[in-house]
Amino acid sequence: MDSEYYSGDQSDDGGATPVQDERDSGSDGEDDVNEQHSGSDTGSVERHSENETSDREDGLPKGHHVTDSENDEPLNLNASDSESEELHRQKDSDSESEERAEPPASDSENEDVNQHGSDSESEETRKLPGSDSENEELLNGHASDSENEDVGKHPASDSEIEELQKSPASDSETEDALKPQISDSESEEPPRHQASDSENEEPPKPRMSDSESEELPKPQVSDSESEEPPRHQASDSENEELPKPRISDSESEDPPRHQASDSENEELPKPRISDSESEDPPRNQASDSENEELPKPRVSDSESEGPQKGPASDSETEDASRHKQKPESDDDSDRENKGEDTEMQNDSFHSDSHMDRKKFHSSDSEEEEHKKQKMDSDEDEKEGEEEKVAKRKAAVLSDSEDEEKASAKKSRVVSDADDSDSDAVSDKSGKREKTIASDSEEEAGKELSDKKNEEKDLFGSDSESGNEEENLIADIFGESGDEEEEEFTGFNQEDLEEEKGETQVKEAEDSDSDDNIKRGKHMDFLSDFEMMLQRKKSMSGKRRRNRDGGTFISDADDVVSAMIVKMNEAAEEDRQLNNQKKPALKKLTLLPAVVMHLKKQDLKETFIDSGVMSAIKEWLSPLPDRSLPALKIREELLKILQELPSVSQETLKHSGIGRAVMYLYKHPKESRSNKDMAGKLINEWSRPIFGLTSNYKGMTREEREQRDLEQMPQRRRMNSTGGQTPRRDLEKVLTGEEKALRPGDPGFCARARVPMPSNKDYVVRPKWNVEMESSRFQATSKKGISRLDKQMRKFTDIRKKSRSAHAVKISIEGNKMPL
């Protein structure tokens, strides 16, 4: 990098045209590269120098640069470098020494002197040193770049000095030529930019000014320092006076001014400067450089392009590769076009700078073409190659002008289209939201109505819901019409009332039947699950899988179906025999075989699916003469029913087993044990209907206690009747408030009295009043005992036992006698 900076690629910071001129005297190829790089960077820097000279004319540079000198003590190093370089330059050129009379003054102020001292050289050295020294404090990267640029510049100035020594006339001549142009640019700040453009910058410079302010605000700290880096660096440098003075410079040097000054129409940049100044000096920069930095995506585009363009735009900080790229004027112009396109896009976002920048770009490219033509005329005398490069750049710039205008127009059109599109989209979205909201409301209403209809179809109307449980109970267990029969008291009324609301849902969930369910519009649609259920029902009586799983047991199905047929036949024969007034013994004779099969665990589900419940109902039902079946039959079948797995409500409903069991439960002549079994069966079968659970494992302790409290019967307190002797309060008697009855007193009883029965139910455990300190202490002490202590205690205990086991020696003297 240093070699490249010293080789002349660093000419960007060292003052574009002087480096070019020196290189003109030195090397033409380097001059081309330096033209483009130094033109781009020093163009911006020269803008600063020219702007700052014009600022000096305006009186701005002093305060602004004084702030630089105040802020830039490190800059003083650079300033000293630029001053030493300027001293060399003073030795090299009297015209430079004349302006160095100013530079020292501006050197103390900071690097305005350097700006004017070496015009484009010391201007960039000064600005870059000034800005770079500022950047050195804040932006080491850019400061290092700017320092390297300063070094490059100063070294460039040194190399320029060497080249000046080689061709002092060329330096002074170029500076003199620059001075006239600078004077022109001083008289005309836009020409100043043009002068800087004509001096250094071919098209790259305006864009370099923009792209540098965007990309290398820091490298261009010379340019973008006054524009943004003053902000970045000046704000970073703790003194935003610098940025603001430099912003005052940047006000005269605004990127718009780069372009504005580059643009022949200085009024546009000035209005824009006025806009940017009225907005804020930062906003001047913000308009171009800052805005393009702030939209750093775009600035990054311009910067990323800039580095690539960068050779054009970032000739200062960009590597020699970029400097090498700069000589490639076509690539540079294209990249600069991209940079300016991105800038124009950024400006299109900033409508203030948009129109001006379009004009600036057009005027820039035009003026740059004129400047390049001027440079070509000057350089034609010096270099034919520079002339070719300038023409090439002019042509590229003319192309880039068209591209920039097109891009600016596109950006405007795009921004307008974006606004209109966004408005239209917002309107459309609003309409869509409204339509969607209305549609969703209608759909919600339809869904609610459909849900209500479905609920009515499933559960019936609300008026029916209250009676649904009763209807289901009546279907399963029959009507309770016989008053003389015993009432079922299996449930507490609270349980039934609390769980009535859940009954319908539980019913629907537990029931397998599709009865009373009107599918409505879903009539044609059957889910896979429903189809599977239908297949299962159709296959239910035919094939069964063994629980072990595996093989089909068709023989078991045959046995089960044959047994059920026999049971139904036996029940029918018994009814016929009963009608004939004959003993009905068919069921009794078949009972052992039925019990044997029904007790087989692997056949229970098969029996249930095959319809054994209806056969059992036939067996438990009373005979035609209203007599109960044999007691043995009732006992065995009730036991088997208890052992059967859970039975679905549909099976209970269709088989009628519930009615038969309820009949037995209520029958006055049924045995107590059978009634208990029947009550348990009814309780178990009806629990799912009322949503009650019989699983107490899932209940917490609090829930169980609450359940016990709720189910606890409310006993009436036993009050003394009027005919009995009023019971005396023993506590009052014992405390002496009332005298104990003596013999002969009314109410005295000369016998021991049985204590009153307590009507208290101890459900809640009484509070434990005994302190637990001792137990806690023991627990803690036990925890504190180590294994060693335990072993020692065991050892001592064993020794004591072993000693006591031996015969005790009695001491005649009475020694070791326990007292």
From Swiss-Prot:
- The UniProt regions of compositional bias labelled Basic and acidic residues, in chain numbering, are 44-68, 85-102, 189-210, 228-275, 319-328, 349-376, 425-436, 443-459, 699-710
Q: How does it assemble?
A: Interacts with SUPT6H; binds preferentially to the POLR2A-bound SUPT6H. Interacts with ALYREF/THOC4, SETD2 and PRMT5. Interacts with HDGFRP2. Interacts (via IBM motif) with PSIP1 (via IBD domain); phosphorylation increases its affinity for PSIP1.
Q: Name one GO cellular component term.
A: nucleus
Start and end residues of each stretch annotated as Interaction with SUPT6H and ALYREF: 523-819
Q: Which GO terms describe its biological process?
A: chromatin remodeling; in utero embryonic development; mRNA processing; poly(A)+ mRNA export from nucleus; regulation of mRNA export from nucleus; regulation of mRNA processing; RNA splicing; transcription elongation-coupled chromatin remodeling
Functional note: Transcription factor which plays a key role in defining the composition of the RNA polymerase II (RNAPII) elongation complex and in modulating the production of mature mRNA transcripts. Acts as an assembly factor to recruit various factors to the RNAPII elongation complex and is recruited to the complex via binding to the transcription elongation factor SUPT6H bound to the C-terminal domain (CTD) of the RNAPII subunit RPB1 (POLR2A).
- The UniProt annotation puts the region (3 X approximate tandem repeats) at 235-296
Locations of Acidic residues compositional bias? 377-386, 480-500
Tell me which family the UniProt entry assigns to this protein. Belongs to the IWS1 family.
The Phosphothreonine modification is found at: T435, T489, T725
Tell me the PANTHER family matching this sequence.
PROTEIN IWS1 HOMOLOG
What InterPro entries does this protein's entry cite?
Answer: RNAPII_TF_IWS1, TFIIS/LEDGF_dom_sf, TFIIS_N
Q: Which segment of this protein is annotated as the motif Integrase domain-binding motif (IBM)?
A: 469-495
Residue positions, PTM N-acetylmethionine: M1
Its PTM note reads:
Phosphorylation increases its interaction with PSIP1.
The cellular location(s) given in this protein's UniProt record come to: Nucleus
- Name the UniProt record assigns to this protein: Protein IWS1 homolog
Spans of the sequence repeats are 235-260, 261-286, 287-296
Q: Which residues form the TFIIS N-terminal domain?
A: 614-692
Q: Which residues carry this modification: Phosphoserine?
A: 27, 54, 69, 157, 159, 183, 196, 198, 209, 235, 237, 248, 250, 261, 263, 274, 276, 287, 289, 300, 302, 304, 313, 315, 329, 333, 351, 362-363, 365, 377, 398, 400, 415, 420, 422, 426, 438, 440, 461, 463, 465, 480, 511, 513
- Region (Disordered) residue ranges read 1-520, 696-728
Could you tell me the keywords of this UniProt record? Answer: Acetylation, mRNA processing, mRNA splicing, mRNA transport, Nucleus, Phosphoprotein, Repeat, Transcription, Transcription regulation, Transport
Provide the transmembrane region boundaries.
none
Its gene name is IWS1
